[in-house]
């Protein structure tokens, strides 16, 4: 079991893709581009270990940048919800 002294920070792990909060303007552009509502995006809980240090709140949108051997980089968007 991890103690506070040797606790693992999930966002710093090599297999966890980069997560970042996007601005309301950028979120609106994404929703317009994909012609969808925020609740139609994949959901992520506000207490998800990958986003704990970002200071997210329900209603925020997260951009996940994944590395891909074929595409190089892939973008993925998730909508933050309360548990």
UniProtKB/Swiss-Prot annotation:
HAMAP family attached to this UniProt entry: RNApol_Rpo5_RPB5 (MF_00025)
Any GO BP annotation: DNA-templated transcription
Location in the cell: Cytoplasm
EC number of this enzyme: 2.7.7.6
InterPro entries linked to this entry: Arch_Rpo5/euc_Rpb5, RNA_pol_subH/Rpb5_C, RPB5-like_sf
Chief localization: cytoplasm
Superkingdom of origin organism: Archaea
Protein name, UniProt field: DNA-directed RNA polymerase subunit Rpo5
Record note on quaternary structure: Part of the RNA polymerase complex.
Keyword Transcription attributed: yes
Catalytic activity: RNA(n) + a ribonucleoside 5'-triphosphate = RNA(n+1) + diphosphate
GO molecular function: DNA binding; DNA-directed RNA polymerase activity
UniProt keyword annotations, A-Z: Cytoplasm, DNA-directed RNA polymerase, Nucleotidyltransferase, Transcription, Transferase
Function statement: DNA-dependent RNA polymerase (RNAP) catalyzes the transcription of DNA into RNA using the four ribonucleoside triphosphates as substrates.
Source organism (scientific name): Nitrosopumilus maritimus (strain SCM1)
One Pfam family cited in the UniProt record for this chain: RNA_pol_Rpb5_C
